[in-house]
Amino acid sequence: MHVRYPLLAALALSIGAAMPATAETVVRYGISMADVPLTTGQPDRGAGGYQFTGYTIYDPLVAWEMNIADRPGKLVPGLATEWKVDDTDKKKWRFTLRKGVKFHDGSDFTADAVIWNFDKVLNDKAPQFDKRQSAQVKTRLPSVASYAKIDDSTIEVTTKAVDSLFPYQMLWFLVSSPAQYEKVGKDWDKFAMSPSGTGPFKLTKLVPRELAELTKNADYWDKARIPKTDKLVLVPMPEALTRTNALLAGQVDLIETPAPDAVPQLKSAGMKIVDNVTPHVWNYHLSVLPGSPWTDVRLRKALNLAIDRDAVVALMNGLAKPAIGQVDPSSPWFGKPTFKIKYDLAEAKKLVKEAGYSPEKPLKATFIIANGGTGQMLSLPINEFLQQSFKEIGVEIDFKVVELEVLYTAWRKGAADESMAGITANNIAYVTSDPLYAIVRFFDSRQVAPVGVNWGGYKNPKVDALIDEAKQTFDASKQDELIAQADSLIVDDAPLVWVVHDTNPHALSPKVKKFVQAQHWFQDLTTIGTE
């Protein structure tokens, strides 16, 4: 397969301009996004954006272990060296902050800076409040009621209710430099072009929709995470074939999500394909609000039974795994549902007929989907395959195709928003790496959008009760058991159409000698090296 793109020549010029004339090591990375994610501290473009302009330029207080490949990571200290819940009031969490850390602009990381950043995204009366950053992270911090400085190296966060899962929320809270914000004239647009965090990379060049140049922060506080390359150039390339051809042409050195049917060609050209178990699910989030056809559980189950998931995996050339629920059966949160998700065309047709529809008298609906982007895999080909699959059972789907960030905005607004009139499913694929992200955000009735991202308005009091019980226990094994019970109920209710789990594939040129593919949607870009 040889596909030529005139765009590649222009890209080569812009990428080349970002490369130094010295002997510095430079790796050019083709990422599956239409633009560089927001660089001010809270990236946009979904969870995938965090690995590019989040955990590179900035740090969270609580971090995720991303530099291992043979097991799932765990929570580890970031800008907080420890965190603990108060013995007498379990709604209060104290975070001990790391000393001696500096922002890229040379200013000190302090408790005041942390409080300033909380205000930046949660306090719309604060002068530094940034609506754009707030939109990215507010729903990821649903438990935060208040926060306060205790002393120069300690802050306290009070949650709305007892929530043993709260530390997982802090993975998403990144810390920008207050001093740099002042220096650029209190303007977040100017800050985006010259940002300052505490992370392992510094942003040294940004050309929107073309590239972001990240330079190694040799003074980074975590010596184990000092980048293995001097410069990392991120190049947005939303189309899989564009990325693949750029890699084959030597215009980039690694890419995410190569075109699946080009894998044999990539391998024969000396490229290395790496992937791993990934907590991620490609799905349709169905509206169960009044007026939606998906209030009928028979139709929800029919969609799940109409899919030949092995064929979807084949479409991905093996770079995916069939999904039989929200999480993989290997997950501690996988329950024991009575509804068994499989390919059963006869049963799917039967359920559709019972609901009053057929191929001769089809149900018609509209789904909103992305034209591509990190996590969406082969968005259009997979959606078109499923469209045909559903047509076989008497369900005709039209697609409203939008850019990924538009889809995320729609996701946060929820199915009840007036902008979603006539749309009854959302196709955001997402991370399922922890109980918050696997279950709570999507199925707790108190997280119905726009409060959270329970897009479709799903409500089950039994699920809510299990989530509440899990939040109130600090015994990890008991938490797992309760979340698995909730998972069972959710799969039986089928508020989503679960299709496949991604394996997060990357293709590396022979130049790239080092890269740790973590069992996570986040990848640690400091592990990329040429020696």
Task: Write out the residue ranges for each language-model feature.
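N-terminal lobe/hinge region of extracytoplasmic solute-binding protein
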Residues: 31-88, 196
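Extracytoplasmic/peripheral linker and loop segments enriched in polar/acidic and small residues
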Residues: 301, 313, 393-409, 437-509, ...
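Surface-exposed binding/hinge segments that line
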Residues: 4, 96, 115, 134-181, ...
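Gly/Pro-rich hinge or "lid" segments in bacterial periplasmic/extracellular proteins
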Residues: 65-70, 171-227, 239, 346, ...
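Append "and occasionally in soluble cytosolic enzymes with long acidic Gly/Pro-rich linkers
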Residues: 213-218, 267, 295-392, 398, ...
